[in-house]
Amino acid sequence: VMDNLRLFDFRLDADSKKAIENVIAGFSPIPGDCGDEYRKPPFLTASGDLSHHVEAIPVPYPTTEGSDGRIKALSGTEWEDLAGFSRAVKKGNRILISGTTATHGAKAIGGNDPAAQATFALDKIEGALQSLGATMEEVVRTRIFVRNIDDWEAVARVHGKRFKDIQPANTLVQANLVGREYLVEIEAEAMVE
């Protein structure tokens, strides 16, 4: 550590600081928040944008088409099999996304942080939309259920960041959610043009 600190044992004069500021001013900032680099192109990794190395990015969840024309997406949680439902269903131009919690497989994600749980649930919703050929921009309605009403603002802020420019119809209510570890559950509806 001390060797690394010695590398920075120097002073910059005013001209050097100004030169650095001028270079930085020419940079294009990456918009968004931590984690956004994995949600929208360009997909930034430690190696840079790798999207040009693949012909197509695979969908997050497998889909199946029913005989009635419905397309179903399954995220693989234990709840889908147990209760007999799909993460999302597309019929015609309408997509309905089931109540979505911060669950990955059989594991709850986000601990006791309602904002982290809301972020993960919205990531799953976005994955379901992508699997059915849609985007978050096509969401027209969301419903948010919180276990503790005191968490409403933290959850609403997460929703606001993700839907800032989309502004779907929304309802947020307190509910006694299934599973003590879950603080947030979110439903969504989309219309694909």
Annotated model-derived regions:
Residues 2-71:
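Terminal-tail/helix-coil boundary detector
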Residues 45-123, 127-140, 146-193:
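N-terminal presequence-like segments and the immediate start of the first folded domain
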